[in-house]
């Protein structure tokens, strides 16, 4: 593809970004309806017996050379909704002869873990857990180590995203993308200049019934703990008790917990204030009809998260799984992921193919002067008091 044509293609894709964790919209079906039909079937169906397929694949600019790949002709993925570029999936299937494709959806890391604990091992090849859940998956024997000789494009990952606490030896996961949790605002309705989590809680009663919140405990605990000046990973009973008061004060004003299509009530002004991720909201900002939408990285601090690609234990199609991991980090392919999902790539080589308007978008690629506000997550999801508060909060929504 000519450089000029590629840039035009990427800019066109940028105008139609989709939510990181939102279900497929009917308008997006097009020639991809066959893929969606496969999604509805899921891995609960008896796997087909695909014939092996091989492909050397075209060498992407900046990507590492790899030997011709022999795949099983099938790949079963368990992932967040709407979290891969449709074009990239079509390209992967065509290049590697993947005729049997399954894409099942989970709405939270907790559900992914629960399904694997319930016996789903061996049903799927690949998943995309958030980084802090990787240790629990390793401990539960739910992952297979990645053979990096089959994923040479791992070398394109920025060093600051390697050998981190959740995988200190880089054995189990490949960074997918990263983003933030923040405040989404329809400014033509919300007239206050909300720049902190503290202000978010203060104005919430005024917009009662018009607040959308992601259905993710780690993200939700971020808001009260940061508003109070604490670590978002706190398990201190006193600090969590204060956070509980803020959350229970917020709960009656929340329209819904929604991790999948939270941008839609924001689009329709059914919700005008949100505790959300960047993806999807970025789409509203780019739409002239909803250009008053704003995404704020709170000044009192917030969560930055990273999602990762993992190969699940006993994968039915291990060669296809490795081929996919290498494919998805080819620079031009990875650039399309960033454009499609509106989340930052850890692959520096991909930035050459990302339009300047996205590279310079501070809600996607967080500037160096804002990054100190961000705090990474630890695995505190099983802390009994946090679990208790979360269940109490969920049961009080809209009440």
Regions found by a protein language model. Name each.
Residues 240-249, 289-315:
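Periplasmic-binding protein-like
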Residues 312-373:
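Mature extracytoplasmic/periplasmic domains
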Residues 78, 83-86, 106-109, 123-124, ...:
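Extracytoplasmic ligand-binding site segments that recognize negatively charged/polar headgroups
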Residues 264, 368-399:
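Conserved C-terminal helix/tail region of periplasmic/extracytoplasmic solute-binding proteins
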């Amino acid at each position: 593809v000519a450089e000029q044509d590629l840039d035009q293609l990427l800019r066109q894709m940028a105008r139609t970004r989709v939510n990181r964790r939102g279900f497929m919209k009917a308008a997006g079906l097009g020639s991809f309806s066959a893929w969606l039909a496969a999604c509805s079937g899921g891995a609960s169906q008896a796997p087909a017996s695909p014939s092996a397929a091989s492909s050397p694949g075209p060498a992407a600019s900046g990507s590492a050379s790899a030997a011709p790949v022999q795949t099983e002709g099938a790949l079963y993925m368990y992932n967040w909704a709407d979290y891969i570029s449709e074009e990239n999936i079509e390209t992967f299937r065509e290049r590697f002869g993947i005729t049997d494709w399954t894409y099942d959806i989970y709405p939270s890391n907790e559900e992914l873990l629960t399904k694997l604990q319930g016996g789903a091992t061996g049903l799927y090849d690949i998943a995309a857990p958030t980084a802090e859940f990787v240790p629990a998956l390793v401990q539960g024997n739910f992952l297979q180590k990645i053979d990096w000789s089959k994923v040479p494009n791992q070398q394109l990952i920025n060093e600051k995203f390697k050998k981190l606490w959740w995988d200190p030896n880089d054995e189990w996961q490949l960074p997918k993308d990263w983003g933030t949790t923040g405040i989404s605002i329809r400014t033509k309705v919300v007239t206050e200049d909300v720049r902190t989590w503290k202000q978010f809680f203060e104005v919430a009663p005024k917009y009662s019934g018009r607040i959308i919140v992601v259905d993710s405990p780690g993200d939700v605990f971020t808001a009260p703990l940061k508003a109070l000046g604490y670590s978002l990973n706190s398990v201190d009973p006193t600090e969590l008790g204060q956070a509980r008061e803020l959350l229970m004060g917020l709960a009656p004003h929340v329209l819904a917990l929604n991790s999948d299509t939270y941008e839609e009530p924001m689009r329709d002004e059914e919700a005008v204030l949100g505790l959300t991720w960047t993806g999807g909201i970025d789409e509203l900002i780019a739409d002239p009809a909803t250009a008053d939408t704003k995404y704020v990285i709170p000044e009192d601090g917030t969560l930055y998260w990273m999602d990762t690609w993992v190969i699940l234990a006993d994968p039915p199609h291990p060669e296809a799984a490795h081929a996919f991991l290498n494919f998805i980090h080819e620079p031009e392919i990875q650039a399309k992921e960033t454009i499609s999902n509106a989340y930052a790539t850890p692959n520096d080589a991909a930035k050459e193919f990302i339009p300047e308007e996205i590279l310079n978008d501070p809600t996607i690629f967080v500037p160096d002067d804002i990054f100190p506000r961000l705090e990474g997550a630890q695995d505190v999801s099983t802390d009994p008091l946090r679990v208790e508060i979360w269940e109490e909060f969920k049961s009080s929504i809209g009440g």
